[in-house]
């Protein structure tokens, strides 16, 4: 079965298609998945041919043996084409319904199933007059087969853009009056009409039944959404219970498709009499690629009775090929599948596709791709037919399940990535700083990076194994084989060393089947090993009895499991894409090892990156200024608070609404001073969440007003909370972007309580009246006001009476995909079921194709007796100014995120060159140096330590809140001065500025206690800024240092040091000084640095002043440092 694809992939992985480095892995993975699918199509086609041949020859179909042979034969292209044609254009349907295909333009029948005449009572005997019998033939006008009202419905459906959204259409046979569900879809030659007999003759009951099915699905969806996050198993267990409750099948399972295309039953709900299938693994060809493609096109598939004889389709001889039945609900199962079902005792089945978002690489035309994650399958031990409305409700449930599953998988992926990243960092640190054996003997070890049975480090000819691994002699043989056949690659991965071509694979046995290896250097390797798959696979089903001689030949879940174990014999579990990404990421060590043998040649690159970062910050500042201008002039109410909830931003619009000026609002408490009591709890929760980074959207709050009419009115605003963050991503407040909905709120209250002249209000052209539509208890549209007509382009007469879900929003007003329709259906049913929905994001295309983005509020609708009779829905459209403000905000957030990524990248990547500098310094220290050279080396080392500490403590929050840990060490003050001066020498030369040093000679040998690196950082930053703004050329900057000794006690002496950094002229720009001393939100990048240095100095009990005189300006830095006895003697 899938062994063909798997064997080929493993062989390629081992024989030369070596895995790429992490930078290109995702693209390789995508291409690899395509090649797997193509290979499986070949295996599927071969298996199908063997089955067909066995039927023609009268021989039995040996299932397990056929799976083995598919891996050993080449399939001609014609055979694959014939196989796909058989699957998609099989020419037969199931007999529980009938099918008619029609030319779309003329309504002329072009194909029909042989049972259509009987099912529609169209036989000649049933016709009163034989002059013109209404017998169904090719060329018949399909409208003549049904009642006039049914024909009108068909004509209307044929004119719809999205015909499937109108399904099912309730129609009646003209001769017998029998009702049918007509399920329509377009194909290449016309429209296919699947006709399924309905159980009642009252269309109203049909609609009520469909709505009831939807309500059951919504209840199940609500249950799914209420589950705690982070548990995919619980989600799958819940969905099988829900589907079994909805449909009544004896067994419901969740099948999951693995990356190598094989499947696994991960959840199951069944009646007690049935054998469990939970944990069953089966080969990929059990569900062929062609079938998987069909599941993506037609997401619900029902087989009513696998024993039933399929009905042939008769078609117009002028058609070029058999009619396509891909989208037909009646398509007959393939004989191979029907036999499989019969063998396992499953007479009827219902299969629901589980679709999630695919990889970015699979996206086409900018649209996100969809991936078939698995299937939810129901089995029944007797024939069973589920009516279309209930199947449609199950499809909605699957869409919600797919959404929920997608979120859970993304969360699990993020947690896994964080774990891998943490492990990678620790492993890299061990290899660079400690003995290489640390990654094996310490925790975490390389076994924690990916799932494996053993791992090893082969370094400088020594072997460090962990877990289940080859012997040292075997590993040396593997290394020799790698260098001989794969010496020019960066690594290798395979799930079968035997298939990869390693001659000694047989000697390793089942203990070591799969291997992944990363080349650290040409002599150093990291290995991961996996044992054979069967060790990992367990099936919860009963084992077959030894006397069941034909067990392997018959198609049955047990034989599938046996076949799967045969396929994966001598194989490990495949290495998943994410695991290979984690392994490849360690290849960064190759560069680190090389850097340790060289110098800081990469420093220039990082300097260029630094310039790019600063340029990006300038652009971000520009965006921020534009954002401030928009906020101040916006016609939408916008206000902001600090971390204590006090107003620090209040634009003109919110001032106008509340009659509270900017000056009066600043500093007031949002919750206690400005919000009505009834909204205080909502505002507190909103603020609390936003300060934790959870940004709530579309929340309604009621604001107080402060004008003369304060007792007679209130202001209602719907706001989005946006966490305000500083440069280091720390939350420093919350900004609220709102929309005034006061007028709409008043109208809404009147509607809900049915006050005043209802129709006059609804259809008023007053711009305060929002777009409104209403639903009856069956989700049919009962109201569509003037504003709604204007918004959508659809008149009231065209809309009233149609189904809101699918017919109006779906066909008339197109939605973006089935997920949007599922969410809308849930909102509508919740409102009818007494659960109101407020400010739900709702988007659709109007009649002219314009995309409308809005907020939807759905409330229950009651009559005078208080009984719920439907739902009222209000649509709010964001103002252009608000939309522009949100666009700018998103742009700012995107830019900020980009800068944070660059900063994180810089902090990570700059460590390797620093290690190179450190290593080079250590080599130089061991050589014979002059005194001057030793001083240069000491200065270089001091600068390196300063850079390392800045990178290591990049979290500025510790500096802001005073929790930064300062080190205490003894050092020469002269060394600090040398290191500080060295950092400005290039800038001095570039700007032709002279440096004057007024420093007493005894400072050079003065020893003090303190955090040398932080003192060095602070002085260097102040000096650098003074040099940057000194007059140029022919300017000067002077450093003055005046030490004074203070005797604190007999044993403690403190040196009181005053540093002066002086330059002539105007000095620093005013905004820089403002950033340094006063601003909580910096404007300039230099100002941020100065502000942080001032706070670091404050932590050391120091002080900084900036003094501007008539002809010069200077920094005055005051710092007290404890002295050693030796230091005090040198000063004395």
Swiss-Prot record:
<feature type="domain" description="PAS 1">
    <location>
        <begin position="623"/>
        <end position="694"/>
    </location>
</feature>
<dbReference type="InterPro" id="IPR035965">
    <property type="entry name" value="PAS-like_dom_sf"/>
</dbReference>
<dbReference type="GO" id="GO:0009585">
    <property type="term" value="P:red, far-red light phototransduction"/>
</dbReference>
<comment type="subunit">
    <text>Homodimer.</text>
</comment>
<dbReference type="InterPro" id="IPR016132">
    <property type="entry name" value="Phyto_chromo_attachment"/>
</dbReference>
<dbReference type="InterPro" id="IPR036097">
    <property type="entry name" value="HisK_dim/P_sf"/>
</dbReference>
<comment type="function">
    <text>Regulatory photoreceptor which exists in two forms that are reversibly interconvertible by light: the Pr form that absorbs maximally in the red region of the spectrum and the Pfr form that absorbs maximally in the far-red region. Photoconversion of Pr to Pfr induces an array of morphogenic responses, whereas reconversion of Pfr to Pr cancels the induction of those responses. Pfr controls the expression of a number of nuclear genes including those encoding the small subunit of ribulose-bisphosphate carboxylase, chlorophyll A/B binding protein, protochlorophyllide reductase, rRNA, etc.</text>
</comment>
<dbReference type="InterPro" id="IPR044767">
    <property type="entry name" value="Phy_HATPase-like"/>
</dbReference>
<dbReference type="Pfam" id="PF00360">
    <property type="entry name" value="PHY"/>
</dbReference>
<dbReference type="InterPro" id="IPR012129">
    <property type="entry name" value="Phytochrome_A-E"/>
</dbReference>
<dbReference type="InterPro" id="IPR013767">
    <property type="entry name" value="PAS_fold"/>
</dbReference>
<dbReference type="InterPro" id="IPR013654">
    <property type="entry name" value="PAS_2"/>
</dbReference>
<feature type="domain" description="PAS 2">
    <location>
        <begin position="757"/>
        <end position="828"/>
    </location>
</feature>
<keyword id="KW-0716">Sensory transduction</keyword>
<dbReference type="GO" id="GO:0000155">
    <property type="term" value="F:phosphorelay sensor kinase activity"/>
</dbReference>
<feature type="region of interest" description="Disordered">
    <location>
        <begin position="1"/>
        <end position="27"/>
    </location>
</feature>
<protein>
    <recommendedName>
        <fullName>Phytochrome B</fullName>
    </recommendedName>
</protein>
<dbReference type="InterPro" id="IPR003018">
    <property type="entry name" value="GAF"/>
</dbReference>
<dbReference type="GO" id="GO:0009881">
    <property type="term" value="F:photoreceptor activity"/>
</dbReference>
<feature type="compositionally biased region" description="Low complexity">
    <location>
        <begin position="12"/>
        <end position="26"/>
    </location>
</feature>
<dbReference type="InterPro" id="IPR036890">
    <property type="entry name" value="HATPase_C_sf"/>
</dbReference>
<keyword id="KW-0677">Repeat</keyword>
<dbReference type="InterPro" id="IPR013516">
    <property type="entry name" value="Phyto_chromo_BS"/>
</dbReference>
<dbReference type="InterPro" id="IPR029016">
    <property type="entry name" value="GAF-like_dom_sf"/>
</dbReference>
<dbReference type="InterPro" id="IPR003661">
    <property type="entry name" value="HisK_dim/P_dom"/>
</dbReference>
<keyword id="KW-0157">Chromophore</keyword>
<comment type="similarity">
    <text>Belongs to the phytochrome family.</text>
</comment>
<dbReference type="GO" id="GO:0006355">
    <property type="term" value="P:regulation of DNA-templated transcription"/>
</dbReference>
<keyword id="KW-0600">Photoreceptor protein</keyword>
<feature type="domain" description="Histidine kinase">
    <location>
        <begin position="905"/>
        <end position="1125"/>
    </location>
</feature>
<keyword id="KW-0675">Receptor</keyword>
<dbReference type="InterPro" id="IPR013515">
    <property type="entry name" value="Phytochrome_cen-reg"/>
</dbReference>
<dbReference type="Pfam" id="PF00989">
    <property type="entry name" value="PAS"/>
</dbReference>
<dbReference type="GO" id="GO:0005634">
    <property type="term" value="C:nucleus"/>
</dbReference>
<dbReference type="InterPro" id="IPR001294">
    <property type="entry name" value="Phytochrome"/>
</dbReference>
<feature type="compositionally biased region" description="Basic residues">
    <location>
        <begin position="1"/>
        <end position="11"/>
    </location>
</feature>
<dbReference type="InterPro" id="IPR000014">
    <property type="entry name" value="PAS"/>
</dbReference>
<feature type="binding site" description="covalent">
    <location>
        <position position="336"/>
    </location>
    <ligand>
        <name>phytochromobilin</name>
    </ligand>
</feature>
<dbReference type="InterPro" id="IPR005467">
    <property type="entry name" value="His_kinase_dom"/>
</dbReference>
<dbReference type="Pfam" id="PF01590">
    <property type="entry name" value="GAF"/>
</dbReference>
<dbReference type="Pfam" id="PF00512">
    <property type="entry name" value="HisKA"/>
</dbReference>
<dbReference type="GO" id="GO:0042803">
    <property type="term" value="F:protein homodimerization activity"/>
</dbReference>
